[in-house]
């Protein structure tokens, strides 16, 4: 077939070369954005008198038809037409005649594809924000049900201090809230229009870029045409934000995997989110959590891939930029899928409160409570720390825990110890007392939950 740009050429490329250079296999995902951008563009052309109202109306009717066909997956794309832009233009001309060729007046594929991707990411980022808010709501529900569920808190994967399971869950709520904030902030930079920048230098036609931007729901336009067609910062920022979100999901999944193991038994995954073994009949594997953890590397790879593409590109457009889309599409699909799986997995998991409670009575995570007890009676904390360290050593040598140590032994270590010490050693009491702002104390958790509910419910409307 003859190319829409073929006037300069005397030879046709081999089929395998065309296939290598074509992007229609993946950029067809931009079909609705491409058509909507074209409708706005031709509307502006008519307003400015660059095409007649009759021509614009005919073009818009043709584009609306193609948009409806696209929604029903009835469009047949061809490699020969290279990309989504030329495929749509070719179909339009075939449907309405040569007047369809006027659509591209005052526009280049360079600003056209940039516009498509801005429209695409604007929609997808809003979808991801909503899905993240839905996951946050699930976290709030689990936290509400586990305010007084006591578990070990960890540092270095060693039991450190008793905490509320709700407090642990809410830590991920606030990580996700930062992710939401980053996505929301990125919309400022996504929601600007490159349309009308042309190939790189603008156009000689008297276009109205602000008008077409307004028609597409953009808040403004790029101030520099070179920047407009070569900028991919908005995609990189999306990939970076998504990498951080996936990192948070991966960290949580790592804990879910550990907690569901026989060594911990803190939770049990629903059968819906686990699989078995082809050889070992007893196995219940946390495959969905493992997949989310694994897919995090995939999103990181998409970020570093585009950073590497961009690092050596001179202004303005280069064909290298064709490599900006597949990683973007893949990241959107991956993040959306992981968020939905994560929400279902957490919502349906069973919390083994008894096992968590046993864990904090069979360790030394209450040692800090004794040090604080001595410090509250006027002993310098460093001296208190030394005394408690010796107590822990004594216990490990005897094969007992701090609650098992008789008061006489405590008094041998320090005369400040009294009978009320044993109240301090209770994991429940230890958690309750940590009532500083942002701490694991029950009053603080109630406050945190109220704030978290407002942030989650405000968006998803429950």
Curated annotation (Swiss-Prot):
Metabolic or biological pathway: Amino-acid biosynthesis; L-arginine biosynthesis; L-arginine from L-ornithine and carbamoyl phosphate: step 3/3
PROSITE patterns recorded: FUMARATE_LYASES
Catalyses which reaction(s): 2-(N(omega)-L-arginino)succinate = fumarate + L-arginine
Chief location of this protein within or outside the cell: cytoplasm
Enzyme Commission number(s) of this protein: 4.3.2.1
Record flagged with keyword S-adenosyl-L-methionine: no
Compartment annotation: Cytoplasm
Listed Pfam families: ASL_C2, Lyase_1
A GO MF label: argininosuccinate lyase activity
Alphabetical keyword list: Amino-acid biosynthesis, Arginine biosynthesis, Cytoplasm, Lyase
Keyword 4Fe-4S: no
Gene3D superfamilies, per database record: Fumarase/aspartase (C-terminal domain), Fumarase/aspartase (Central domain), Fumarase/aspartase (N-terminal domain)
GO biological process: arginine biosynthetic process via ornithine; L-arginine biosynthetic process
Highest taxon listed in the record's lineage: Bacteria
Top EC class for this record: lyase
InterPro entries noted in UniProt: Arg_succ_lyase_C, Argininosuccinate_lyase, Fumarase/histidase_N, Fumarate_lyase_CS, Fumarate_lyase_fam, Fumarate_lyase_N, L-Aspartase-like
One term under GO cellular component: cytosol
Family, as annotated: Belongs to the lyase 1 family. Argininosuccinate lyase subfamily.
Listed HAMAP family: Arg_succ_lyase
NCBIfam families per UniProt: argH
Protein name, as recorded: Argininosuccinate lyase
Lineage: Bacteria, Bacillati, Bacillota, Bacilli, Bacillales
Gene it is expressed from: argH
